[in-house]
A protein has these predicted regions:
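Flexible "arm" and connector segments at domain edges
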Residues: 1-64, 68-101
Length: 101
């Protein structure tokens, strides 16, 4: 399955819940999705608080999936081709030099 197929499935779910409706109590705006993305990313950190390895990889997988879904949705509603953006960023990073510590 590719990024577009995942995005389509995510959009189907959001539509089926009515979250794209104008009167939705969960308006799917770029701002709200960015906030949700950050909150879900913070939940990933909880799995590593005071430990080097996640204590429950199944729960961690769910949090990673939440982050990915919000990222796909944010890219979708802002008209960003996430696959292209990722490939472009990889090319930029190939040429980038990071400080060696």
């Amino acid at each position: 399955m590719d990024i577009q197929e995942l995005t389509d499935r995510m959009n189907d779910l959001v539509r089926s819940k009515g979250w794209y409706d104008e009167d939705s109590k969960r308006p799917q705006t770029p701002r709200n999705l960015a906030i949700s993305l950050a909150l879900e990313a913070a939940e990933i950190l909880e799995h590593f608080q005071f430990r080097e390895k996640a204590k429950d990889t199944e729960q961690l997988a769910g949090e990673l999936a939440d982050v990915a879904l919000y990222l796909l949705q944010l890219a979708s509603i802002t008209g960003i081709d996430l696959e292209k953006a990722i490939l472009d960023k990889i090319e930029v990073n190939k040429k980038r030099e990071w400080d060696q510590e």
